[in-house]
Amino acid sequence: MTTSLLLRPRWIDPVMFLYDNGGGLDDTSKNMEGFTGGNFSPSPCRNLMSHPASLAPSATYPSSEVAAAAAGDSGKQCSPCSAVQGSASASISYGYFGGGGYYPCRMSHHHGSGGGVKTCAQSPASGSPYGEKYMDTSASTGEDYTSSRAKEFALYSSYASSPYQPVPSYLDVPVVQAISGPSEPRHESLLPMESYQPWAITTSGWNGQVYCTKEQQQTGNVWKSSIPESVSHGGADGSSFRRGRKKRVPYTKVQLKELEREYATNKFITKDKRRRISAQTNLSERQVTIWFQNRRVKEKKVVNKLKSSS
């Protein structure tokens, strides 16, 4: 049985604990050694393996590099003791702390063969043993990126034969069609793009004033033509949305006569009186209220004008 021991050090240097678990639980406490960097006290029988110098404490390395570095240093710094050589297949678990986390490893010795290293290093980011499966062990370079993008664009068979014409100063992005088969090309464009002229931009700013041609100004009417048209059509039934101020409708002579008669009786209108006038003149109560307000303002202006003239 192989167990792993994980301890969090209080110092900066990487720490590795190495122990032999082949002799039972009692041997675990005896064959256990902790050291910092590579400075450790000598012992008659200890299986010790320090971390390679290439692994800096502040760097994170993938599992493949850790396994290769551990395999290269196992033959130099680790010599199996007699207790390990006497067992049929003894395994030694070890691990070290780096700047990215803890990397546990296992080294097994067999009769008649040299010490082989069996790594089970896992990524510090994932605590499960399946973290290596989702770990990217190869650094992506520019050539790999170019080749992968070339394979991606190889799927778009209709990129070269796109029905759309390239427009200057715009990003040339292909329209991705269905992979099952090319669709029918569109022969008409959404907007007339023939009159487009790219603006000249220099390092110091805009290169003078740029004026649009007459054809370019006419293209803007395509977006605005639908709004006045809908308003003009909706004016007949009055059900659609109306923009702007409502058209003023003058009162008839019969309505004005009735309103003036009520105003001569009382300048301020009550609620019951407003309802009665609204029913007689075929006006809304709001219209009646507004007319009385305007009539009082008009009379006040006339009185002030007479006072100022006299």
From Swiss-Prot:
The listed locations are: Nucleus
Q: Name one GO molecular function term.
A: DNA-binding transcription factor activity, RNA polymerase II-specific
Task: Read off the Gene3D superfamilies from this record.
Answer: Homeodomain-like
Predominant place of localization: nucleus
Q: Which SUPFAM superfamilies match?
A: Homeodomain-like (SSF46689)
Keywords annotated in UniProt: Developmental protein, DNA-binding, Homeobox, Nucleus, Transcription, Transcription regulation
List the SMART domains hit by this protein, alphabetically: HOX
The DNA-binding region ranges are 244-303
DNA-binding found in the keyword field = yes
Query: So which domain of life are we looking at?
Result: Eukaryota
Asked if the keyword Transmembrane helix belongs to this entry, the reply reads no
Which Pfam families does the protein's record reference? Answer: Homeodomain, HoxA13_N
Q: Cellular component terms, GO, for this chain's entry?
A: nucleus
Q: Which GO terms describe its biological process?
A: fin development; negative regulation of transcription by RNA polymerase II; regulation of transcription by RNA polymerase II
**Family label:** Belongs to the Abd-B homeobox family.
Q: What does this protein do?
A: Sequence-specific transcription factor which is part of a developmental regulatory system that provides cells with specific positional identities on the anterior-posterior axis.
The name on file for this protein is: Homeobox protein Hox-A13a
What organism is the protein native to?
Danio rerio (Zebrafish)
Q: What is the lineage of its organism?
A: Eukaryota, Metazoa, Chordata, Craniata, Vertebrata
Gene encoding this polypeptide? hoxa13a
